[in-house]
């Protein structure tokens, strides 16, 4: 189930898209419950995408075991578009599984979203709550921790 963590981080960022048009330049940086991956969500042409801007050492190690050189810079969210009712749908790349699957995101409020990713036609799903973070204060905390 840890393999879904990256997926949910990306999906969480998508929840802000519900209240922002697909043409929006920047929807912020989002993180999952364990803060091991942070994803920046932005418009990419006619849709929305999410790219990893931070990964913990463990998340990076897991990605390397799957054949990636680095997790940072990977586009995990692709072709996300609003579906109505405060939701979005698109494709999510899961590096640790080496698969792209369908994902949804539901915008709860300006700083909270619920992300869901499923495999096997929806037979196995996992959902998490993600939060939007203040990148400047987080960067300061990262520097002071080291």
Each language-model region and where it sits:
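C-terminal segment of classical bacterial N-terminal signal peptides
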Residues: 14-22
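Absolute protein N-terminus
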Residues: 1, 22-26
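Central antiparallel beta-sheet cores of small beta-barrel/beta-sandwich binding domains
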Residues: 26-27, 33-102, 135
């Amino acid at each position: 189930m840890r393999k879904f963590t990256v997926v949910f981080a990306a999906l969480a960022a998508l929840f802000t898209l519900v209240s922002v048009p697909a043409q929006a330049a920047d929807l912020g940086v989002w993180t999952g419950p364990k803060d091991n991956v942070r994803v920046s969500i932005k418009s990419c042409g006619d849709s929305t995408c999410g790219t990893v801007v931070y990964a913990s050492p463990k998340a990076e190690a897991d990605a390397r075991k799957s054949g990636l050189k680095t997790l940072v810079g990977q586009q995990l969210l692709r072709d996300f578009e609003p579906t109505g009712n405060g939701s979005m749908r698109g494709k999510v790349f899961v590096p640790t599984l080496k698969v792209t699957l369908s994902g949804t995101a539901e915008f709860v409020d300006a700083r909270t979203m619920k992300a869901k990713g499923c495999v096997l036609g929806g037979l196995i799903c996992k959902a998490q709550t993600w939060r939007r973070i203040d990148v400047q204060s987080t960067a300061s905390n990262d520097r002071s921790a080291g």
